[in-house]
Amino acid sequence: MYIDALDIYYVRHSMIEPWTTAYGSDPDIYSVMVKMTSGSETAWSESTPLLAPTYSPESAFGTYYTVKEFLAPLVLHKDFSSAQEILQAMSVIKGNPFAHAAIEIAWWTMQSKLTKTPLHTMLGGSDDEVEVGADFGRQDSIDILLKRIDGAIADGFKRIKLKAMPGWDLEMLKAVRSTFPKHTFHIDCNSGYTLEDLPLFKEIDKLGLAMIEQPLFHADVIDHAKLQQQLDTPICLDESLSSPYMAEKAIELGACKYMNIKPGRCGGLYNSWKINELARQAGIGCWIGGMLESSVGAGICLELAAMPNMTYPNDLFPSSKYYTQEISKEPVVFSSPAKMKPSNACGNAFVPEEDRLAQRIIQHTHLE
């Protein structure tokens, strides 16, 4: 598949309310969108690091700059027959998985379009419905959180993820568990703790959570392995899994019992598929996470969630949860309570509407 042109967009999506985690609060979501042109066809990708390098070392503008200045020249006016080829062409640029993903995912959606093959089929998945969960960041009070959890359970969500951070952890969790003693919960710590917090995790270990997601340093697998050895509750790695290499090391060390896969953080769809395969072979279950993408990126994550070995409800959400207006004509919606269905479209299931994209553009680069 020959790449004739690339349009790279740095965009801002306004949220209904800020999203608060251990690393801060985000009132808007910033992302990089790439429109790839091959012949008369176009295909899209979205990669969504946050505004600041708080979740990972990448920022949204830094990703935009890396794509347009360094990665795009490596792939423009060239022909690639596989994802491995395009990743190899970009491999001279170290790290920066969100930037690599912006290009690589566009290759996948274009290949899906040109070969008339749904993306989930290319990734070895099916079009069966996938189960999704509910997530809650830090709330203004525990009472507000409990009311929201009650509503999510009534809506049919079988598992609920709670953001945890110093000052919003054990007391909150005890209140949740005493109110909902049998429901499935897990916490996402976003690297907010260290091994010195072992006494806290020993207390959390008594609460019967499904997992503790990324409790320690964002690039670590060694300390996570030490922590996992001392807890019955499974650890799930998120930020640490920036590549298949890191997944291999996590498996070797016994650093986790679950893996969260995000295509931006992993460097694209091939790496996401590879990490899932490594996990499957090791008997480790996976699930798909999100970065609060618009429908363009969320639709791609939904296709990933159709892969085998997705053993836990995914972090996929309807557009109405976060955005007053979606960038595409059609929003992301549930296919049935707490479930979503992959698209049988070839290429992108969701593409930006020109006027809605124009309202969100901060910077745009066209290369041909």
Whereabouts are the PLM-identified features?
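Active-site donor-binding loop signature of nucleotide-sugar glycosyltransferases
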Residues: 47, 214, 316
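N-terminal capping/lid subdomain adjacent to the active-site entrance of alpha/beta enzymes
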Residues: 1-185, 191-195, 203-206, 326-368
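Histidine/acidic residue-rich metal-binding segments in metalloenzymes
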Residues: 177-179, 202-206, 225-230, 252
